[in-house]
Amino acid sequence: MAVERSKRINLYDEEKLKQVNPENMKLLEKYHIDMSIRDLSPNTVYGYNVDLKQWFIFLYDKQFNLSVLEATEDDIEEYYFWRKQQGNNVNRQKRVMASISAFYKFLRKKKLITESPVEFIDRPKEGQAVVTQTYLTKEEVQLMREKLEEYGDVQLQAYAFLSLTSMGRVNAIANLKWSQINWDERFFGDVLEKEGKIVELSFSLETKEYLQKLIKYREEKGIDDYGWVFLSPYVTPDKPINNGTLNDWCKKIGAMIGQPTLHCHDFRHSYANLMKSEGVNLEDISTMLNHSGTDVTKKHYLKQDTKKIREIKDSISI
């Protein structure tokens, strides 16, 4: 059964943003410089930017256009409580809290504040997943292969099988450039992953063929992709494809194979689980996923084999 998505809260208003406390906007500009120096991905910066601007508009609307330097723990808790009342689920709430916390960490680093007002605000405990986790079977992967071939969009083929066989996170996939490919060894190098890790994303022989077909197609059509692997009408030399666009592609692929809740992260879950079913050990799967340890892999990425557990229990007579 699908889990209902968190209600989308959109405070963004161009006119109100012009009225936001100028000090807040200047601090945000400084934060942008800091994020640029740290070489955060464009999508990460975009996420922080959206979260912080929505908060600034709340400060303008509900809290007398308060400066973030003067906001107290109570002021910020009021914002979190308001979001919860509007329908945010735990996962979305945690992301907003993380964005504001990171901003205050920057302000403290720059000695603009002595204490962070969010330091002692507890994060909500683990809640329901934003969307259902889908574990694709070998049969569904084969069906996906057939349906995509029939559909005839080579970019969609390349995306699906690169995401699946590389097990890369959506943000890493979105930011891939052709210059990062080692064709002989079949991997993308110097890939920026979660928490600033630099990793390799290896891919299958089948994926290599799709990527080569994609290059040939663009050359024949005279399409300038600005060096990015994946392309949409909104991609520019400095702006990669948006994560939301990749998620839309996932929905399209999911609809083809009878999995309407399919989303980007499901490719990671699915390939990890398929590897497990083929006898690959947990440590190797964890390394493929670029996890720091096996705990996360086991808890969040591998589907529990309840049938095997029942068989073990039935084999013991007490």
Describe each model-derived feature in a short phrase.
Residues F161, T165, R268-H291:
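C-terminal catalytic core of tyrosine-transesterase DNA break-rejoin enzymes
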Residues A129, K138-V170:
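Basic, Lys/Arg- and aromatic-enriched nucleic-acid-binding interface segment
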Residues E4-R5, K299, K303-I318:
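DNA/chromatin major-groove-contacting recognition/catalytic segments
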Residues I181-W183, P260-T261, V280-K299:
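Short, polar N-cap/turn motifs at the start of nucleic acid-interacting alpha helices
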Residues I113-E115, G127-L143, E195-E206, G222-Y226:
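DNA breakage-rejoining catalytic core of tyrosine-based enzymes
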Residues S204-Q259:
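Active-site/catalytic core of tyrosine-dependent DNA strand-transfer enzymes
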Residues N175-Y210:
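Conserved tyrosine-mediated DNA breakage-rejoining catalytic core shared by Y-recombinases
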Residues E29-V131, G258:
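N-terminal core-binding DNA-recognition domain of tyrosine recombinases/integrases
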